[in-house]
Structures are given as C-alpha cells and as structure tokens.
Amino acid sequence: MTKKLLTYCKVKLVKGFSKKFASLFCRCVVSHLSDEDDSDGDRYYQYNNNCNFIYINIVK
C-alpha cells in the first residue's frame, strides 16, 4: 500500500513539474514572438493548457 502511494505521489509530482515547465516555456516563447513583430497591432496570443497538451494559437 505504501509503495503504491509513493509511486502515485512521484507521478503526481513529475506531472505537476512538467506542466509548470511547459507553461513557463510557452510564456517565454510567446513573449519573444510578440517582441519580434508587432507592426500591425492586431495580433494576440491565446494560451491554453489542457492536461499535458499545450496549444498556442497566434491569431492575426
């Protein structure tokens, strides 16, 4: 029982860390992209984090 609980906690910790890392990475990429080309002013970024999938929609 304790071995299963320990494994569950490890998996939960790794998933939480990977979500935070992906979130920070995507924010960094989005901020870098917004600094490069901001000529039209109509561009906005939508960031959605759903489970382990990261979607970045760049809409002009």
Swiss-Prot record:
It comes from the Viruses. InterPro entries: AcMNPV_Orf72. This is Uncharacterized 7.1 kDa protein in IAP2-VLF1 intergenic region.
